[in-house]
Structure formats: C-alpha cells, structure tokens
C-alpha cells in the first residue's frame, strides 16, 4: 500500500505555534477546513438570498431547498414549539454537512473524523438543550427521568437507567458521526492504495470498488449530517414537551 490510511486524519499546525499558557491554540489543518466550511455556507446563502425571483438561480434554489428541508424536519420531529430554534438546528446541520462533504475532496481534511470535534459539538447541543429544558419547566424537567406507569418497586432502577441514558447522549451522538466518517474514509484510502499497488492490470477491481465506495460515502456524509440534526431535534423535543 502506498501510504498509511490513517495519515489522512493527522492534525498538523499551519503557521507559527501559538500558546495560551500551557494550551496550544495554533491554527491547524482542522481549523482551516472548519473556517472554509463556514465561509462556504455563508457564501452560498449570501448569493442565494441576493436576488429573490420567481425563477430562482441555482444558489437561490439550493438555499430554499435547504431551508425547507430543515424547517420540515424540525416541524415533524419537535413540533411548532421548536420553531424559535430553527437557526440553531439549521446551523448545526449545514456545518456538519459541509465538513463531511469537504472531506470527500482529495487532500482535504475531514473535520468530523475526529472525536474531539464531534464531542464538542454534541456537548454543546447537550448543554444547550438541558438549559432550555430547565428554563421552560424548572425542576419539573426532572420528570423526564420518571416514566409514567412504572411500578414503584422498579422506579429507582428505571430512574438510574434514564439518567445514564440521558448523560450518554453526547457520547452516542459524537461517536456515531466520528466512527462513520473515519471508517468510510479509511476504507476509501485502503481501496485507493490497492489500485496504486496493483497497477493498471490488477487495479480495475479495487478501482471499481473505490468508485462505488465514494458514491456511498457521499450518501453517508449527507445521512450522518441528517441523523446528527434530527437527533438534536428529538432531544430538543424532549426538553420542550415532557412526554414522561
């Protein structure tokens, strides 16, 4: 194999080393692609909203489809009460989607293939949703951990399970995204290495697999952004509408 498939996930510094005390806050390739993803989102929606016409341009159509898609996802999952949080969900979905998609470009860096990035995103969502829950319901939000209709003898055990399940949300949310992106890109690199190693004659089969895997990985990149956003909507729904 030409190169180690894990080298693509290496974070390296761009420019001078910058430290805040003992903490290294240098600009890295991960930082670069987060900035690129954010700027690309701003550029597309800025161009898409410049001229609102009955016959939309490609950028306007993309902007409107994205807006409608996320708006419907929020309505179907969290209801009308979640509408004030549209910008929050929309920003998360688009950021994860663009980070995933930029990772499909050769020699680009997949930001979401690092657990620290996905865990910080998931933790931010977890803390934000928890704050919203307590702001809306006060201490009544704790009823989320007490399901109705549970026999008194089982209640202590069920409450413990519910608390553990709740606290594990940022872990499951972050690991799901990180694991899928890392696994997919590793497989693509492995098959790409086979193509190079086997040459023109023997490389046709792994090349075919590599092309098919690339198409699948593009689909996975979108689906993982969708799953990340829709789970955020579900958590927000729990905070806004106590079903227990």
UniProtKB/Swiss-Prot annotation:
<keyword id="KW-0472">Membrane</keyword>
<feature type="transmembrane region" description="Helical">
    <location>
        <begin position="216"/>
        <end position="236"/>
    </location>
</feature>
<keyword id="KW-1133">Transmembrane helix</keyword>
<comment type="function">
    <text>Key component of the proton channel; it plays a direct role in the translocation of protons across the membrane.</text>
</comment>
<dbReference type="GO" id="GO:0045259">
    <property type="term" value="C:proton-transporting ATP synthase complex"/>
</dbReference>
<feature type="transmembrane region" description="Helical">
    <location>
        <begin position="85"/>
        <end position="105"/>
    </location>
</feature>
<comment type="subunit">
    <text>F-type ATPases have 2 components, CF(1) - the catalytic core - and CF(0) - the membrane proton channel. CF(1) has five subunits: alpha(3), beta(3), gamma(1), delta(1), epsilon(1). CF(0) has three main subunits: a(1), b(2) and c(9-12). The alpha and beta chains form an alternating ring which encloses part of the gamma chain. CF(1) is attached to CF(0) by a central stalk formed by the gamma and epsilon chains, while a peripheral stalk is formed by the delta and b chains.</text>
</comment>
<keyword id="KW-0813">Transport</keyword>
<dbReference type="InterPro" id="IPR045083">
    <property type="entry name" value="ATP_synth_F0_asu_bact/mt"/>
</dbReference>
<protein>
    <recommendedName>
        <fullName>ATP synthase subunit a</fullName>
    </recommendedName>
</protein>
<dbReference type="InterPro" id="IPR035908">
    <property type="entry name" value="F0_ATP_A_sf"/>
</dbReference>
<keyword id="KW-0997">Cell inner membrane</keyword>
<feature type="transmembrane region" description="Helical">
    <location>
        <begin position="144"/>
        <end position="164"/>
    </location>
</feature>
<feature type="transmembrane region" description="Helical">
    <location>
        <begin position="115"/>
        <end position="135"/>
    </location>
</feature>
<keyword id="KW-0138">CF(0)</keyword>
<keyword id="KW-0812">Transmembrane</keyword>
<dbReference type="Pfam" id="PF00119">
    <property type="entry name" value="ATP-synt_A"/>
</dbReference>
<keyword id="KW-0066">ATP synthesis</keyword>
<feature type="transmembrane region" description="Helical">
    <location>
        <begin position="25"/>
        <end position="45"/>
    </location>
</feature>
<feature type="transmembrane region" description="Helical">
    <location>
        <begin position="193"/>
        <end position="213"/>
    </location>
</feature>
<dbReference type="InterPro" id="IPR000568">
    <property type="entry name" value="ATP_synth_F0_asu"/>
</dbReference>
<keyword id="KW-0406">Ion transport</keyword>
<dbReference type="InterPro" id="IPR023011">
    <property type="entry name" value="ATP_synth_F0_asu_AS"/>
</dbReference>
<keyword id="KW-0375">Hydrogen ion transport</keyword>
<dbReference type="GO" id="GO:0046933">
    <property type="term" value="F:proton-transporting ATP synthase activity, rotational mechanism"/>
</dbReference>
<comment type="similarity">
    <text>Belongs to the ATPase A chain family.</text>
</comment>
<keyword id="KW-1003">Cell membrane</keyword>
<dbReference type="GO" id="GO:0005886">
    <property type="term" value="C:plasma membrane"/>
</dbReference>
